[in-house]
Every structure is written in C-alpha cells, then in structure tokens.
UniProtKB/Swiss-Prot annotation:
Belongs to the RnfG family. GO terms for molecular function: electron transfer activity; FMN binding. The chain crosses the membrane at residues 11-31. InterPro entries: FMN-bd (IPR007329), Ion_transpt_RnfG/RsxG (IPR010209). It comes from Haemophilus influenzae (strain PittEE). This is Ion-translocating oxidoreductase complex subunit G. One of its GO terms (biological process) is electron transport chain.
Amino acid sequence: MGTVKITSRYGILLGFIALLCTIISAGIYFLTKDKIDAVIAAQQRELLLQVIPQDYFNNNLLESAVIPQDKNFVGIQKIYFAKKDGNISAYAYETTAPDGYSGDIRLLVGLDPKGEVLGVRVIEHHETPGLGDKIERRISNWILGFTNQSINEHNLSEWAVKKDGGKFDQFSGATITPRAVVNQTKRSALIMLNNQALLQQLSTQVK
C-alpha cells in the first residue's frame, strides 16, 4: 500500500514538472516569437533586394507574394510582385530546379517584365561541397553572371552552359549543377514572358 502511495506521488510530481516545463516553453516561445519573426522577415527582405534592386519598387515585397495555382506556373512556388506607384515593375520567383546533381535546387529569380534577369540567388541546395556549391554567392561569383542578362525568342540557344553551346560557364568537374540553375532560370523567364495576362490578374491580389 505504501509503495502504491509513493508511486502515485512520484507520478503526480512528474506530471507537475512536465506541465511546468510546457508552460515555461510556451512562455519563452511567445516572448521570442515576434523577435524571431522579425529576424526572418529581415532575412527575406535582404534576399529579395539581391534580386530586385530597391529603386524598382515602393511597395512592401513581403506582402506582395502570391502562390500561383495555374498549370502554366508549374515549378514556380511563389511570385513576389514589385510595384512602382501601383504599376508592376518586376517579379521575384521562388522556383525549384528539379535536376540538380544531388536533388532539388531552390532559387529566387528576379525578372523585369521585358525579360531582363535582375538577379538570381540560391535559397537551398544539397550539391557537393567544393564542386556544385559554387552556385552559392558566398562561395563564388558565378551566380552574378545572370544579372542584367536578357532572354527573348532570338537568344534562347544562348541560355545554356557552354558545354551545351550556351554562354554560361560550367564548373570544372560539375556540369550538372550549373546546367540545372541555368535551365530553371530560363524556364522561369519564359513562364513570365508567356503569361503576362495571368500575371496581371494575379497582381490584383496584392497591393
């Protein structure tokens, strides 16, 4: 009987400790949530500014995102609409290259409505360190090669790595990774150019 009472007391004590830990954890979360959200928002803004220069827009890019549902936007997860005085001035596409050497490569691609690439950055990848990871800005300048490059019906063949007859450098010992990034940037630009009317419709959902 005494053993049962002791066990019950320990059970109650452990339950109380677990409840107390939960309350403390929840309190810490709510106290720090705003700070964490602010840090994440600042990081997102900084990344967006790397693909759409500030002088292109005066709206809030973080509040201008739309998740496209139309089949014409396959491979595009999110579109940010940059607007200057209410008019569309540029887009930032969150998109995924499915054919990296080690799987998906998530990209952020900035474009103006006429087909000029304003910037490209890698959001996430799993490419080989020392080879494919040169797509990262912190490791090499390769990704800057897209900035101010235009795409149109007359230069589509140029949008490939040099090994495939295009104008973009590949990496020594790692052609698959840069090829995937070039091809997905090209796809994103063509989706933008070929769906202007749909983009105008989507833009009405944001300020």
